[in-house]
UniProtKB/Swiss-Prot annotation:
<dbReference type="GO" id="GO:0045727">
    <property type="term" value="P:positive regulation of translation"/>
</dbReference>
<dbReference type="InterPro" id="IPR000640">
    <property type="entry name" value="EFG_V-like"/>
</dbReference>
<dbReference type="GO" id="GO:0003924">
    <property type="term" value="F:GTPase activity"/>
</dbReference>
<dbReference type="InterPro" id="IPR038363">
    <property type="entry name" value="LepA_C_sf"/>
</dbReference>
<dbReference type="InterPro" id="IPR009000">
    <property type="entry name" value="Transl_B-barrel_sf"/>
</dbReference>
<keyword id="KW-0378">Hydrolase</keyword>
<dbReference type="GO" id="GO:0097177">
    <property type="term" value="F:mitochondrial ribosome binding"/>
</dbReference>
<dbReference type="GO" id="GO:0005759">
    <property type="term" value="C:mitochondrial matrix"/>
</dbReference>
<dbReference type="Pfam" id="PF00679">
    <property type="entry name" value="EFG_C"/>
</dbReference>
<dbReference type="InterPro" id="IPR000795">
    <property type="entry name" value="T_Tr_GTP-bd_dom"/>
</dbReference>
<dbReference type="InterPro" id="IPR031157">
    <property type="entry name" value="G_TR_CS"/>
</dbReference>
<feature type="domain" description="tr-type G">
    <location>
        <begin position="55"/>
        <end position="236"/>
    </location>
</feature>
<dbReference type="GO" id="GO:0005525">
    <property type="term" value="F:GTP binding"/>
</dbReference>
<keyword id="KW-0472">Membrane</keyword>
<dbReference type="InterPro" id="IPR035654">
    <property type="entry name" value="LepA_IV"/>
</dbReference>
<feature type="binding site">
    <location>
        <begin position="64"/>
        <end position="71"/>
    </location>
    <ligand>
        <name>GTP</name>
    </ligand>
</feature>
<dbReference type="InterPro" id="IPR006297">
    <property type="entry name" value="EF-4"/>
</dbReference>
């Protein structure tokens, strides 16, 4: 028993206790050490995983509002199952990006396989950590496709928030078993009973089924593991069938190419076997297989029901299509597994190097980041004012912020980002116009400079979202005022409790991409939460607003606005330009034009030399002659001069 205690509890002490065992024979010591090494090796032995039957596998995810303790709970579950050692430094173990640790959010979905003994049986629990923010809902959707149930985590202090509602409906739509859990019950202001009642009011969840835990100190976390085993069903997987697997995430490794995170639906796969992509038809040889615990542990095979990492020498991330089905090459046909609807970018922004000499470096940095984020779209763009750059498409504002921050942190790049815009759908009219656009009756435009004139268009459509706002009741008036100002239409209103109300609005995406969230937080003193989901395109009265400087069109300053806001937006923009453009030798007329009509104008006065300063009396005709000569000179200069608008002016107008 002494040797067993030393080996299992503190293996590092073996060399220190050898003198205590010197009386044993060499054969006994060798036999004991051999037994020890076999036991230690068994933790990495792949047979421990692939010999666990499908009935004892649980694939689950944790979904929650931002900062409700999702990553902290994941840390505790990893510790309780012995996947990682218990230590004070275990914070956001599954969050590997620097931006994730700084912002306290999850951006990329991560996975960890946990071995959990329960009632004399060994269970394999595959934890798939998901992002919490709406912008990364595609990551959530990918993760849930490999799950059979979810833990719905709610802060017992803050209660149900907007993204809690969105995540609940996402899980319900996929018909997943939901285990409700209240976190942070150790806080002084925690109100678990009231929050449990909120869950019943909004989702009809029985308060008696709600678990109460503190992920920070570990209270009640073991009960979560037990309920995962009890409530969640095993995956619908068949090991006797031929191999099929679903790719639900991927990332790029500079040495191994695209690595695929897969859920094995049927059969098994071994290293050296050949597989085929159902989407592209390309064949690959499996180079590596691994379980994530949460670091990679190489295995020889993955079997149905398991989640693991598959490397097959895909050269680019474009070969790895999220939602694609992989199948064995020996099979002649492929029945694809239900995949995902590809996410379309909702917000676009121009990205330009601050110095054009940095263009190649910034291009390389963007290409490397896009390898790991397939949701970003990239197209070349150029501007006379800002030079060569790119127009990038993002899922939302946080997605844009995170991408920009990763450019700065990981590649030390500090680009110019223009104000975000959205994509408009346009229905063209006239056979010639449709033919000029490749025969497409409908086109999508994200660059305002390319927005077609009304004479070419039958109908304009702009993207709308269904927004959910949860806020204190006393803030209802100001919030309604803000939403009405942003052209929002109220759909529903529900009192969660005596102090908070949940309202849903149909609102244009263009009205919320800039500062809506900041304004909402300001008028609610930070207590309101906001979430939105895509609602498709809605017909809208849109106009293109051009900016003219002394009659010359400036493409970089073109914007698309709703006709009801054209006048007010035009006044704001021309006034801002008047303040930013430096005075010059000629007078500058700053005009905002909509449909050929000037809707706002400001005049920037020219520098003027006092040509009469040398006069000291005498005939007034001399004075008039000098002033006339000056006026004619200014007129001639205005006709031939180019207006010099500094680059900084464009940056200040266009930047976020």
């Amino acid at each position: 028993m002494l040797f067993k205690l030393v080996t299992f509890s503190r293996p590092i002490q073996i060399t220190q206790t050898i003198p205590l065992l010197i009386s044993q024979s060499r054969r006994t010591i060798a036999r004991s050490l051999s037994t020890t090494s076999r036991w230690l090796a068994s933790d990495d032995d792949d047979t421990r995983f692939d010999q666990i039957p499908v009935q004892r596998i649980r694939n689950f995810s944790i979904i929650a509002h931002v900062d409700h303790g999702k990553s902290t709970l994941a840390d505790r579950l990893l510790e309780l199952t012995g996947t990682i050692a218990k230590k004070a430094g275990n914070k956001q173990v599954l969050d590997s990006l620097q931006v994730e640790k700084e912002r306290g959010i999850t951006v990329k979905a991560q996975t960890a396989s946990l071995v959990y003994p329960y009632e004399g049986e060994t269970y394999l629990l595959n934890l798939i950590d998901t992002p919490g923010h709406v912008d990364f809902s595609n990551e959530v959707s990918r993760s849930l496709a490999a799950c059979d149930g979810v833990i719905l985590l709610v802060d017992a202090n803050e209660g149900v928030q907007a993204q809690t509602v969105a995540n609940f409906h996402l899980a319900r739509a996929k018909q997943l078993v939901i285990v409700p859990v209240l976190n942070k019950i150790d806080l002084k202001n925690a109100r678990p009973d009231a929050v449990a009642q909120e869950l019943f009011t909004l989702f009809e969840i029985d308060p008696d089924e709600v678990l109460r835990i503190s992920a920070k100190i570990g209270t009640g976390c073991d009960a979560v593991l037990k309920e995962i085993v009890r409530r969640l069903p095993p995956p619908d997987a068949r090991r006797e069938q031929n191999f099929r697997a679903l790719i639900f995430d991927s990332w790029f490794d500079r040495y191994r190419g695209a690595l695929n995170l897969v859920f094995v639906k049927d059969g098994e796969i071994r290293t050296g076997q050949e597989i085929v992509s159902c989407h592209t038809g390309k064949a690959y040889e499996v180079k590596s297989l691994a379980m994530l615990r949460p670091d990679e542990r190489k295995v020889d095979r993955l079997v149905a029901g398991q989640v693991g990492l598959l490397g097959c020498n895909m050269r680019t991330s474009k070969e790895s299509n999220i939602g694609d089905t992989l199948y064995a090459k020996k099979d002649k046909t492929c029945v694809p597994l239900p995949g995902f609807k590809p996410q379309q970018p909702m917000v676009f922004a121009g990205v330009y190097p601050a110095d054009q000499s940095q263009h190649p470096y910034l291009k390389s940095a963007i290409e490397k980041l896009v390898l790991n984020d397939s949701a970003v779209t990239v197209s070349p763009d150029s501007s006379p004012a800002l030079g060569q750059g790119w127009r990038l498409g993002f899922l939302g504002l946080l997605h844009l912020d995170v991408f920009s921050q990763r450019l700065q942190q990981e590649y030390d790049a500090d680009p110019i980002l223009t104000a975000p815009s959205v994509t408009y759908r346009i229905k063209l009219k006239g056979a010639k116009i449709i033919a000029a656009h490749g025969g497409n009756e409908e086109i999508y435009v994200s660059n305002p400079a390319l927005f077609p004139d009304k004479t070419m268009v039958e109908e304009y459509y702009e993207p709308y979202v269904l927004g959910t706002i949860i806020a204190p009741t006393e803030c209802t008036g100001p919030i309604i005022g803000l939403c009405v100002e942003r052209r929002a239409i109220q759909k529903t209103s529900i009192n969660i409790d005596n102090d908070r109300i949940m309202t849903t609005y149909l609102m244009p995406l263009n009205e919320i991409v800039l500062d809506f969230h900041d304004q909402l937080k300001s008028i609610s003193s930070g207590y309101a939460s906001f979430d939105y989901e895509d609602h498709g395109y809605v017909p809208s009265a849109l106009v293109r607003m051009d900016i003219l400087l002394n009659g010359q069109l400036v493409d970089e300053l073109c914007t698309v606005v709703h006709i009801s806001k054209a006048q007010s937006h035009a006044k704001e923009l021309v006034l801002k330009l008047k303040e930013l453009i430096p005075r010059q030798m000629v007078q500058i007329a700053i005009q905002a034009v909509v449909g050929g009509k000037v809707v706002a104008r400001e005049t920037l006065k020219a520098y003027r030399k006092d040509v009469t300063s040398k006069l000291y009396g005498g005939d007034v005709t001399r004075r008039m002659k000098l002033l006339k000569q000056q006026s004619e000179g200014k007129k001639k200069m205005r006709a031939i001069a180019n207006i010099n608008v500094p680059k900084d002016t464009f940056i200040n107008v266009l930047k976020r």
